[in-house]
Amino acid sequence: MEYRIEHDSMGEVKVPADKYWAAQTQRSSQNFPIGVGLETMPREITHAFGILKKAAAMANHSLKPEKMTDEKLAAISQACDEVMSGSLNAHFPLVVWQTGSGTQSNMNANEVIANRGNEIAGKKLLHPNDDVNMSQSSNDTFPTAMHISAVIAIEDKVLPAIDKLVATFKRLETENEGIVKSGRTHLQDATPIAFSQEISGWRSTLERDKEMLQAALPFLKTLALGGTAVGTGLNTPKGFDVAVAKAVSEITGKEFRTAENKFHALTSKDELVFAHGALKALAADMMKIANDVRWLASGPRDGLGEIFIPENEPGSSIMPGKVNPTQCEAVTMVAVQVMGNDVAVGMAASQGNFELNVFMPVCMYNFLQSARLLAEAIVSFNDHCACGIRANKEKMHHNLHNSLMLVTALNPYIGYENAAKTAKKAYKENISLKEACVSLGFLTAERFDEVFHPEQMV
């Protein structure tokens, strides 16, 4: 491998000749060989750095054009566009397990953008610190990258995934109107419910999850940029924080604003805890929905068997013909991972000692993993399972009319205690509710038929 010599305040460092990073990134690679190749800083963070570095250059150009010249702005902007597009991903090697402020990742961005910008300009035009990092500190850039990436992940990935599954459930509601089945509570038979009503519960659950995520977004759309080292805004021109938030909004097409209190923005990660709580709620609800589906699909002969789900692949290496609810299992495993991530996010957020949180990389690594896994799992569940759900009408009808909980319909006519006696007799003697009720003398056969209509109990 060919190398070039880079230097920083600590001296010279050998850097791979074909990489845009420089001394500080190289030192981090050497000092933190933890999870290399497996737990790289999330690409969402890298791309967010591209956004905020371009925005900072735009703000600096408008506020102090004598330092951020047209030529420098053009070079930085083009390099940042390449960072945002992902075409420079290979030049961002650092792992999550580094300094808790994300300083090395900030410098990785500064070095790559400066060296690529110099290549674009055809001369030594940009300095990583003096130009690319102008009016910034790692302490306000990394929190800003966290919020930008979180907003993009939720708005562009998670919410569209929810919308897709909601649309499927709406279609299933319409298709299954008029089908009545046994309801179940405590995993025991309960009074009847329309299958469309059961599906509407799933749909409404997801709609509420979407509302909770949307409620978290305004908090995430506040940016720390402009606070610099400890929140005082040292070395920033007046109005930089407002200008840079406006520039981020222009670049992303999303409405960001500067944080009202930069001291809070640097040291507290409560907005991310709140937002991840909404992701955890979504995970819990997806766990419930997936479990409902696999219970209803259990069988085919010895389970509930009330719905059919798509047969996507062989289910067993030893039992021929077995088909398992694999999409449901994938969703539930994702839900477990998200619930574990919530603990990590909360613990990391609690480590904001004095003026700076120093658990930011691990906080965001888990947050973004949760958002990504949920979005992808929901789409997969929708496309490979939910879209193909079909009611087993015969099994639903059989289970409904075999349920002892239909006796609840008799309460107004024979009273609770007599209804309980009817159900117990029917169960003990393995006879129908009608036979039990008539034999106990509570109703005549004709009267029973007049008042007992399971399909009307919904």
Regions found by a protein language model. Name each.
Residues 1-458:
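Conserved, well-structured ligand/cofactor-binding cores
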